[in-house]
Amino acid sequence: MLDQNVITETKAEHLLHEYQPGAFFLASPHRVLLAKGICEIVPEADGQNQMETLSGRIAEALRQAKQSGQSRPLVVGAVPFDQVKAARLVVPEEVRWSGPLQFDHEEKEQQAGHTYHIKPVPEPEDYKNGVEQGLARIADGTLSKIVLSRSLHLTSPEPIQTDELLRHLAQHNSHGYTFAADVSSQEETSPRRTLLGASPELLVSRMGTQVVSNPLAGSRPRSNDPVEDQRRAAELLSSAKDLHEHAVVADAVAAALRPFCRTLEVPEKPSLIKTETMWHLSSVIKGELSDPSVTALELAAALHPTPAVCGTPTDLAREAILSIEPFDRGFFTGMVGWCDDAGDGEWIVTIRCAEAEERSLRLYAGAGVVAGSKPEDELQETSAKFRTMLRAMGVDHI
């Protein structure tokens, strides 16, 4: 179990500023984790489905770390969207904790330090055509929901400073989950690749027997006009389409958690949460484990991927995504987090994120498509979601 005594006197801001590429960083509303070095690497599985044996491979890595002298080992890293792709998980050599980030000043709007060449993949019109394909599969009854995403490929003449980018993300998103994880290929000649972002969505947290999940579905872009901003929030909360989209996700999360829980509290209706750029419909689902040996990773594996990032039915939606989207999602819409040898852990949905490699960045954003969705609206929603990363980079618009 995570011992609250390991929450040190170190200020969270110090851990943020100590982060360097190659380390693991996760700031949640409750704590900050900085992990460095590699004691053990969780190996890839031999079979096609990497998730099937992931819990066992993590348990073995933790056991090896204990034999090496670690008293309270934990695993950190990221799991991709596609279950046939390998996760990037390690037992770090050094782990430091603190309380949550609490900035005593508001950061000024970030100015762009680089000039970027930006290429959308797919092009906006092609993305809208993809939404039409998704709507056709909904209309013929194949799917009830599909989440379709697009990407921005940014290149710069200068190396990407991921440590600076992480600090900007954290200062603008202190109420969510800011993360950075090394997802480099294990081949020695490969360049370093870093997954970083600021997600508002908790896939699952397990502390002792207490379980929490916070699915989000249904959203609106924020407005700089306070009156218009509140109008959009109220409209979202009363939108039949968005309430239906949210109910599909919340019901699926509850159904996945129920077999593990002695009790489960599911809100009758969603509430609103906000980030700097978006309004979201949110349901905080809380439960108590019936079997205390079930780990945070096992719960996360049962939930991943939720309809919030994939669709329903899950397998058919995943197949449609692979057919419609012209790129590999990588770790986008996967999960990032940690799990210790007692089973405690936090796993975050990897949205509002990018993968950085040398002088390039790949940003990702998706939108849920259900009956009644309009392609232009979904395009605008993805544009709004890109703003989390773009603002941290000092890019006003694309």
Curated annotation (Swiss-Prot):
Catalytic activity: chorismate = isochorismate
Pathway(s) served: Siderophore biosynthesis; bacillibactin biosynthesis
Pfam family, one: Chorismate_bind
EC number: 5.4.4.2
UniProt key word Manganese: no
Gene3D superfamilies (alphabetical): Anthranilate synthase
Residue positions, PTM Phosphoserine: 271
Superkingdom of this protein's organism: Bacteria
EC category: isomerase
Annotated keywords: Isomerase, Phosphoprotein
An MF annotation (GO) of this entry: isochorismate synthase activity
Residue ranges of coiled coil: none
InterPro entries membership: ADC_synthase, Chorismate_C, IsoChor_synthase
GO biological process, one term: biosynthetic process
Membership in a protein family: Belongs to the isochorismate synthase family.
Protein's name according to its UniProt entry: Isochorismate synthase DhbC
